[in-house]
């Protein structure tokens, strides 16, 4: 199993599948289509049935049931794309067997070193086989580790028919990293009662709470005149943007929050005297607090409009996704089965809120409750990203055990 994980994963990460937020195609990049087509062929080779790839790049397949019991159809999902935060082109994975727990020089020429001082969790992987970057790209373990684990688990179940299971559906989705993963996902065609995304991090991760999320785009309109004769005439749009930001509580930003604390995050600010544009994301686990945060944004805008004129500030604000907990709680048994599966494999479940979103956040509100499970990756979205093959193997075992337990308990 370990060699299959290494072979598949190192091959998959070499395919550039970064999504592109500026693209309006689906998927947003051709690399995702190329990767999807490859996976279609490999799913067929493994022995899965009903293997499809639709016009939007969504890959689906079926592991047929090998039991006469009436077992709920479950699904496992991962995403095809990698993050846009750092380059994902020409990924050169480096395999470190029997890792000694010390610093790894990823790139001597560029002096890129993965150190325990910067990443304190690193020594805990002593003795593992870990895969790193060469210091010039991200790795793409998010989410090619999860995707690999699903492929290997399905292959194992096909070749070990003594493990009884119901019908299992598999899906690989595009554009998750830019929040569009579920946009064209056909829940009805997928046909599962519930699913799990394999899109987590370190060993034991089990997540079924996510942020409530909104995005706010603010346009500040100024009046530009010659600065020498600007008195009582000029209105500086960039200063309006600064004034707006000054009304938000300083301590309620990502760099000051953790756990269940929400925040306002200024993602970008661009402009000049004539016009400036700011983009914020608003996040909170509690729905009432989430609505209160949006009200705060709206109230600041109203105050500034009263002060400077209606056209001085224009707000566009949209909800992006909601806390999946609301949809998971009524079917809590899907979390319990994953929890029990981990415990039976001597894995200590680490239940914590996702300070972000997964495809599962949106899919849960589309009628497919979908918690998230660990994959073994660390330091996602950058050159210090790595994955433990030993933990990937544990994730495969969890997938197999979940499928087995659903059949056993049917």
Swiss-Prot record:
Organism superkingdom: Bacteria
What's a single GO BP term from this record?
peptide catabolic process
Location (main, coarse): cytoplasm
A molecular function annotated in GO for this UniProt entry is: tripeptide aminopeptidase activity
Q: Can you list the GO cellular component terms from the UniProt entry?
A: cytosol
Q: Where does Zn(2+) 1 bind?
A: 79, 142, 199
Protein's recorded name: Peptidase T
Organism encoding this protein: Bacillus thuringiensis subsp. konkukian (strain 97-27)
């Amino acid at each position: 199993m370990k060699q299959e994980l290494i072979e598949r994963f190192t091959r998959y990460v070499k395919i550039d599948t970064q999504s592109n937020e500026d693209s309006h195609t689906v998927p947003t990049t051709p690399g995702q289509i190329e990767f999807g087509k490859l996976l279609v062929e490999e799913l067929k080779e493994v022995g899965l049935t009903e293997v499809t790839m639709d016009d939007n790049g969504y890959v689906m397949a079926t592991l047929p049931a090998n039991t006469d019991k009436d077992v709920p159809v479950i699904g496992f999902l991962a995403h095809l794309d990698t993050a846009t935060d750092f380059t994902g082109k020409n990924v050169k994975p480096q395999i470190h067997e029997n890792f000694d727990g010390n610093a790894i020089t990823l790139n001597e020429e560029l002096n890129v070193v993965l150190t325990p001082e910067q990443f304190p969790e690193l020594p805990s992987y002593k003795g593992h086989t870990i895969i790193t970057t060469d210091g010039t790209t991200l790795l793409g373990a998010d989410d090619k580790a999860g995707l690999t684990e699903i492929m290997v688990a399905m292959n194992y179940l096909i070749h070990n028919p003594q493990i009884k299971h119901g019908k299992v559906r598999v899906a690989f989705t595009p554009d998750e990293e830019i929040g569009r993963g579920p946009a064209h996902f056909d829940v009805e065609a997928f046909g599962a009662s519930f699913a799990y995304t394999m899109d987590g991090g370190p060993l034991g991760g089990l997540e079924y709470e996510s942020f409530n999320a909104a995005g706010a785009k603010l346009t500040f309109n100024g009046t530009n005149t010659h600065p020498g004769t600007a008195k009582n005439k000029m209105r500086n749009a960039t200063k309006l943007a600064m004034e707006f930001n000054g009304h938000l509580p300083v301590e309620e930003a990502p760099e000051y929050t953790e756990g269940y604390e929400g925040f306002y995050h200024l993602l970008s600010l661009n402009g000049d005297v004539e016009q400036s544009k700011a983009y914020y994301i608003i996040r909170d686990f509690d729905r009432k607090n989430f609505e209160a945060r949006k009200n705060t944004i709206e109230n600041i805008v109203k105050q500034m409009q009263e002060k400077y004129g209606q056209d001085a500030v224009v707000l566009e604000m949209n909800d992006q996704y909601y806390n999946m907990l609301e949809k998971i709680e009524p079917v809590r048994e899907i979390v319990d089965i994953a929890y029990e599966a981990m415990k039976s494999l001597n894995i200590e479940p680490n239940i914590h809120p996702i300070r972000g979103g997964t495809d599962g956040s949106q899919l849960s509100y589309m009628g497919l409750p979908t918690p998230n499970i660990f994959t073994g990756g660390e330091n996602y979205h950058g050159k210090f990203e790595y994955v433990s093959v030993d933990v990937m193997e544990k994730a495969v075992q969890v997938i197999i055990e979940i499928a087995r337990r659903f059949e056993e308990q049917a």
